[in-house]
């Protein structure tokens, strides 16, 4: 099984996937990008690596039994399931600023969340029948992990389009 856990930065991907009890190899893409050199350069304005998506796809090509966690994980090929973590934009902006992001970066990510950018990309790339949307706003990390586990165990139906934050914009 090839699974992506994706979502706007700050939705809880790393925390939740760290609590899963799964036989899948859990890969934290943000770590791999640096250690494996899967980037083209650095964005001087944001201070972040510019991910080479083709290199990432090549890195995971042919690998089965893997769960990839990242805000870019939905861009991988041949995924069996894409779990998109969502969070209320106001809560997301607070989380991001609490962890040290600038107000501008937090606002940019909150706007992306309100517009469902990652969800839209996931559905466009993999179809609604492969996408599972989970709202993390009022859930504990353990509850989010349990919801992801339900997807892995086949106990949850696809749910793309069930969370709506467009009133934020």
Curated annotation (Swiss-Prot):
Region (LID): 98-108
Protein's GO biological process: ribosomal small subunit biogenesis; rRNA processing
UniProt EC number: 2.7.4.3
Residues that coordinate or bind ATP: 10, 12-15, 99
PANTHER family the record matches: ADENYLATE KINASE ISOENZYME 6, POS9-ACTIVATING FACTOR FAP7-RELATED
Gene3D superfamilies according to UniProt: P-loop containing nucleotide triphosphate hydrolases
Name of the protein this chain belongs to: Putative adenylate kinase
Oligomer and partners: Interacts with uS11. Not a structural component of 40S pre-ribosomes, but transiently interacts with them by binding to uS11.
Catalysed reactions, semicolon-separated: AMP + ATP = 2 ADP; ATP + H2O = ADP + phosphate + H(+)
Domain of life: Archaea
Region listing for NMP, in residue ranges: 28-51
SUPFAM superfamilies (alphabetical): P-loop containing nucleoside triphosphate hydrolases
InterPro entries: Adenyl_kinase_AK6 (IPR020618), P-loop_NTPase (IPR027417)
Organism (species): Halobacterium salinarum (strain ATCC 700922 / JCM 11081 / NRC-1) (Halobacterium halobium)
Any Pfam family hit: AAA_18
